[in-house]
Structures are given as C-alpha cells and as structure tokens.
Regions:
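Conserved glycine-rich Rossmann-like NAD(P)H-binding loop of the short-chain dehydrogenase/reductase
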Residues: 1-13
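The beta1-alpha1 cofactor-binding region of Rossmann-like NAD(H)/NADP(H)-dependent oxidoreductases
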Residues: 9-10, 30-42, 73, 185-186
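Substrate-binding pocket helix/loop in short-chain dehydrogenase/reductase
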Residues: 67-68, 72-80, 160, 172
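Active-site loop-to-helix junction immediately N-terminal to the catalytic Tyr of the SDR YXXXK motif
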Residues: 71, 111, 115-123, 135
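Active-site helix of classical SDR
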Residues: 91, 125, 133
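Alpha-helical segment proximal to the catalytic Tyr-Lys
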Residues: 96-97, 138-142, 200
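Short C-terminal tail/terminal secondary-structure segment
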Residues: 114, 174, 192, 203-214
Length: 214
C-alpha cells in the first residue's frame, strides 16, 4: 500500500506501521494532489516499491465552509484545486498506469443531495468528481478497469468536525434515520467492497453510503 499524505507525517507513518503490523507492506509518500509533479512522483514511488498498481483510492480533500460570494473566491479556488483538480490528476495517472482488473475509486459526498448553505465550493468540487468518474469509466472501455465513487454522508473525521460546534455536530448526527455520524470504518468497508472481486460488475456508479442521510 502506498499512503499518500499532504502534511501529517506522524499520522502517515502510523498508518504505514499499522499496515505492516497487519502483515502487509506499505510506504508513505508526501504529495499535494493539486501539483502534477507530486502526483506523478507518488505513482512512481508506488510502482518502484511494488512493481504494479492495482487499486487507486483518491480520498484527498478539503471542506472549508463559504457562502457563494465574490469575497470567497480564494476559498473556492483552493477547494477546486484540491478536490477537483487533484481528482483529475490522480484519476488520469490511474488510467494510464493500471492494468486489467484494476479498480479506481474516488470520494464524493452525499451533501450534494442536500445543498446546505455554505457548502457551495465543496459541493461544486465533488459534483465535478462524480462527472469525472462517469466519463473515465467510459474512456476506459475494453480495459477491464472499473471506476466508481463513494459518496459518504457526515463522517466523524477531523475534516468534518473541524470548525463545528457540539450543537451543530449533534444536529448533523440526527439527520440520517440511523441517527449517528458514520465512522471511518463504515466508509472503508464500502471502499473495500469496490476494490474487491465482488464489485467486478459495478462500474461508473456513485455509492451513497450515508445511513439514509440523502
């Protein structure tokens, strides 16, 4: 496993250690997915370490809250750079480097279906990701590579919790009929399914793993 990370070296190294403790091999590669040279270097490192790439999961993302206002253009640009430009770069390298049986998985969001105020830049970026997934699945026709997206609802991660009050978090947790936030393991299980043999006939789809949130 090649673990790409933006800046949290300690967390990346801990993830690598956990993978190795479980009996597999792993490396960590620091990369900004908005930078073409970083994405190329990340794939090069994976190929150098393991000889091939079978599954690519693009989960890099930012989620700043900003209304649709001219004064928030910098926030919009930054969100698009990481979430959409980054997805374009990662998916393009995956398309050129994976062989038959490969799996490409991108992360979207179920917030697209709810259109909450303040989520404009984030929703715009993730709607673009879903478009890329469907187009790439068709561009890879005949190569036996699937391209799908997972669209979680609210997940109890640092990205989601940052900047929200306890009352806001509780309110969001009550939105799904299951009345809780998802855990990272909930979403990882869906990604694992798409990466595995049982999902060989699932292609160009967006799986909305959200507990009924949307």
């Amino acid at each position: 496993v090649a673990v790409g990370y933006a800046g949290n070296t300690a967390q990346a190294e801990a993830t690598v250690a956990a993978i190795r403790d479980a009996g597999s091999n792993a490396i960590a590669v620091r990369a900004d997915v908005a930078r073409p040279e970083d994405v190329a270097r990340m794939f090069d490192a994976a190929l150098a370490a393991f000889g091939r790439v079978d599954v690519v999961v693009n989960s890099a993302g930012v989620m700043p809250m900003a209304n649709i206002s001219a004064e928030n253009l910098e926030v919009f640009d930054r969100t698009i750079a990481t979430n959409l430009r980054g997805a374009f770069l990662v998916l393009s390298h995956a398309a050129s480097r994976l062989g038959a049986g490969g799996r490409i998985i991108a992360l979207s969001t179920s917030v697209i279906a709810r259109s909450f105020p303040g989520y404009g830049p984030y929703i715009a970026s993730k709607a673009g990701v879903e478009g890329l997934v469907r187009v790439l699945a068709n561009e890879l026709r005949g190569r036996d590579i699937t391209v799908n997206a997972v669209a979680p609802g609210p997940v109890a991660t640092e990205l989601f919790l940052e900047g929200k009050s306890p009352a806001q978090i509780e309110q969001m947790a009550k939105l799904p009929p299951l009345e809780r936030l998802a855990t990272p393991d909930d979403i990882a299980a869906v990604v694992s399914f798409l990466a595995g043999p049982d999902a060989g006939w699932v292609n160009a789809q967006v799986l909305r793993a959200n507990g009924g949130f949307a």
